[in-house]
């Protein structure tokens, strides 16, 4: 790979390099890199993209540093998980009461991946993907395939 490095981040016990390549910013796990060197007479690329880049937002959208399509996902959560949602997504997203006094919804940008589905499943029946329909359907397919595995 040939990249223009911009920032190092620490996530899940590993450092990741966020760098510009192929017209966009991508991340690479540092401990898996080999033969790293600076190329002579190269110009750092991606300054405009990095200026518009928010590292914290990028990290909040991703689960386990796995990429996926970026979607605005709505989660329906039991009230007891409000703290967990704030811990994960910060205080920016609005927690909207559902009207039953027991649940709220939160809509957040997510890079949808199997790791995201695993994170949601970790809350058991207390957190559900409410939308969009294609993400909810993908969550259901994931859970169905896991259930089939353990029959």
Model-derived features: positions:
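Core beta-strand-centered patch of the WYL/Sm-like small regulatory domain
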Residues: 1-64, 69-74
